[in-house]
């Protein structure tokens, strides 16, 4: 019973951390990374399709992404989708390859992205704390139903707190790494 609550809390905290990593991947740094274009949707025969399904995206070098479009007739649509996305990127077509140079980040944009990263990290911390609160509430319910003793509840609560501390430390570590990445010129 107690182990199930701890495992559930641990799994949910892990999902929160994965969600944070995914959110951080969308925040653009000065370097080219294929995940930057993950949110771009292309109009493919009238239906919005993720860019990854119509083109192969690779980092050509530190500041350039190269896209190889599977269907040659889609080159203009892919180029338009990248331009209309709110990423501030200007693709250049060279034959069958679309190159997307990454503009250098200004100090102001870096600070804006850092603020965004901190907000994402804070929402991850809040999610982890809410998971802890839910787990502690479940433990209290077990005590009320006399399924576990108060000592067992206290021990389990300490273990849940350790899981929470570990998860929040991982959030802080991920934020620190992202901030360092953003501020590196």
From Swiss-Prot:
**Which keywords are on file for this protein?**
Cytoplasm, Protein biosynthesis
Q: Which molecular function term from Gene Ontology is one that the record holds?
A: ribosomal large subunit binding
* UniProt cross-references to SUPFAM superfamilies, sorted A to Z: Ribosome recycling factor, RRF
* GO CC, any one term: cytosol
| Gene Ontology process terms (BP) | cytoplasmic translational termination
UniProt similarity note = Belongs to the RRF family.
Q: What is this protein called?
A: Ribosome-recycling factor
The coding gene here is frr
């Amino acid at each position: 019973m107690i182990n199930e609550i701890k495992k559930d809390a641990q799994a949910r905290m892990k999902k929160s951390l994965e969600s944070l990593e995914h959110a951080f991947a969308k925040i653009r740094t000065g370097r080219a990374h294929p995940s930057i274009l993950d949110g771009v949707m292309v109009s493919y025969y009238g239906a919005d399709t993720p860019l990854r399904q119509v083109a192969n995206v690779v980092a050509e070098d530190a500041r350039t992404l190269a896209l190889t479009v599977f269907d040659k007739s889609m080159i203009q649509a892919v180029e338009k989708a990248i331009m209309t996305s709110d990423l501030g990127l200007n693709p250049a077509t060279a034959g069958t390859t679309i190159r997307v140079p990454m503009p250098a980040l200004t100090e102001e944009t870096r600070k804006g992205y850092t603020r965004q990263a901190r907000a994402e990290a804070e929402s991850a911390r809040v999610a982890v704390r809410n998971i802890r609160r839910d787990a502690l509430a479940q433990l209290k319910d077990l005590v009320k139903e006399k399924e576990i003793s108060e000592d067992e509840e206290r021990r389990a609560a300490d273990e849940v707190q350790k899981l929470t501390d570990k998860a929040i430390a991982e959030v802080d570590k991920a934020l620190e790494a992202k901030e360092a990445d953003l501020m590196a010129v």
